[in-house]
Amino acid sequence: EIMQTVGQELGLSEEIARNLVSQTALGASQMAKVSDSSPAQLRQQVTSPGGTTERALSTFQQDGLEAIFRRAMTSASQRAEEMSKDFSD
């Protein structure tokens, strides 16, 4: 959703932004599914020095995306445990 919104803010039409986002997600998931490479290896394979992916990854790192993912996943896991207990009572 955020990727599509930003794409539109950068001047893409809604249709093109949606298609780019869905194709990016589909391509990444298919690569991960069929490859024997680790996620880190796949990232290295698609990251051209000085390219757009490298720039985006650098921004993610600088802005603390890893910490955001860790907090979000931990929070969701904790909520799943709470819900499991609620349903088992």
Regions of interest found by a model, annotated:
Residues 1-19:
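Anionic-ligand binding region
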Residues 18, 22-89:
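NAD(P)-dependent Rossmann-like dehydrogenase/reductase catalytic/cofactor-binding core
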